[in-house]
Amino acid sequence: MAGSEPVSAEGESMAVDAAPRKPRILLAASGSVAAVKFANLCHCFSEWADVRAVSSSGSLHFIDRASMPKDVILYTDEDEWSSWKKLGDSVLHIELRKWADIMVIAPLSANTLGKIAGGLCDNLLTCIVRAWDYSKPFFVAPAMNTLMWNNPFTERHFISIDELGISLIPPVTKRLACGDYGNGAMAEPSTIYSTVRLFYESKAQQGRAVVTLR
């Protein structure tokens, strides 16, 4: 199993100190064909941050695990159950939540969007979301067919997750995997990476300014 290595929850906050560590980024993929780009996304982030990855069962149909960075562990639903044997053992979705400074779901499918908006937690990914500390940054990059994107439920669901403080990295208009042309394609991995990194470094700079003022 890819996720057999234990997770350390040490250093839950994004505190900036004299010798700052790398940011800890938890990347997650849900079951959209855009998950074919997930390995590329992990490579983008792993050059800058410590990365852990989570995949839903649906996303595994599209992720090329052989292309994943060697230093990035990919956790699956199987790991959630196999890592717990008895009372007192660590719970994977809690440990990953504690470990991460930032969570990014890319791609976010219509199905997983609906689950998050409704508070459902029936797999490793959605259990992490349900247990997430929303004082920490959380980004999603949706990917779905244009008609699914334009469905009235999608707007309602995004209103719900926006109230939690989850930030949207909007989809783009292009030829989709199904052959249709329209909005709903996931933003490019480079765009997702630059958005998250710019946010993190901006917050870190603000933190240093506060320390200096004190």
Swiss-Prot record:
SUPFAM superfamilies: Homo-oligomeric flavin-containing Cys decarboxylases, HFCD
Domain of life: Eukaryota
Induction: Induced by salt (NaCl), lithium chloride (LiCl), sorbitol, cold and abscisic acid (ABA).
Catalytic activity: N-[(R)-4-phosphopantothenoyl]-L-cysteine + H(+) = (R)-4'-phosphopantetheine + CO2
Entry-linked InterPro entries: Flavin_trans-like, Flavoprotein
Tissue expression per record: Mainly expressed in roots, to a lower extent in stems, and at low levels in leaves and seeds.
Known pathway: Cofactor biosynthesis; coenzyme A biosynthesis; CoA from (R)-pantothenate: step 3/5
Subunit and partners: Homotrimer. Interacts with CYP2 in the plasma membrane and nucleus.
Protein's name according to its UniProt entry: Phosphopantothenoylcysteine decarboxylase HAL3b
Organism: Glycine max
